[in-house]
Amino acid sequence: MPDLAAGVAPAVRISKEQVTEVLEAWGKNSLAGTAFARSLYIRQSLSRSGQDASEAIKAELNRSLQRLSREQRRTTADLFQTGQSVRNVARGMGASESSVYRYRTAAIEQLAEEWTQLEAKAWRNYRSLIEERAQMGSSPLFGVAENLTVLRKALLDTDKAWVIGVDGIGGIGKTSLALAAILDHAILTRFDDVVWVSARQSQWHPVYGIVNATHPALTYASLVSRVLEQLIGAQA
């Protein structure tokens, strides 16, 4: 079988160990505590369907099992859902124990590949949504490695303040810097969602230099409105 997950970044890969964790939790009704429950794909499924994590994972597991071979599907259900031993499963199928292990391994590998593709697609779509909200695409940055490191560290530090400012005159790349930090996988996984509101209170004029706006570029009411528009739009 070709590796459908080839080329996918390790950060979004659903490993065989994570699949095994899901299958073992399947028969114990403890799916909500698995690593897969924290994946972006499942979190988005919860947002769309209103299901809890266990229901969402069961639904995805049932869909995925239907794409396995009959032997792989039966082996997976008997071993994990009903908790039978390899010996009993082999007897029930009229197969050797080595065949049961082979079906088990192949099933886990296929589930890992399929779920990795689902997770990778979810991340690609989410990154595109964030770039759309920021009204700009991600682009290479030069000479800002130190600033980017500081910003990423601040966003990942749970002891830091709730509000982190990126200050400077208009046009120096603050939005690009913030976008580059936000698109970091470790940062995106920390938050349920990211909304984007940008305001420019001053701008550079070639004759007059820095010119301040005569009215507030962003009010509290407009901030709340723009945040809600993005959150509601994402759930539509």
Regions found by a protein language model. Give the residues of each.
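Short, leucine-enriched amphipathic alpha-helices that occur as contiguous helical runs
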Residues: 58, 69-73, 148
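A short structural micro-motif
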Residues: 81-84, 100, 110
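Short, locally clustered residues in the helix-turn-helix/winged-helix DNA-binding domain
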Residues: 77-81, 112, 155-156
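Short amphipathic alpha helix immediately N-terminal
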Residues: 67-85
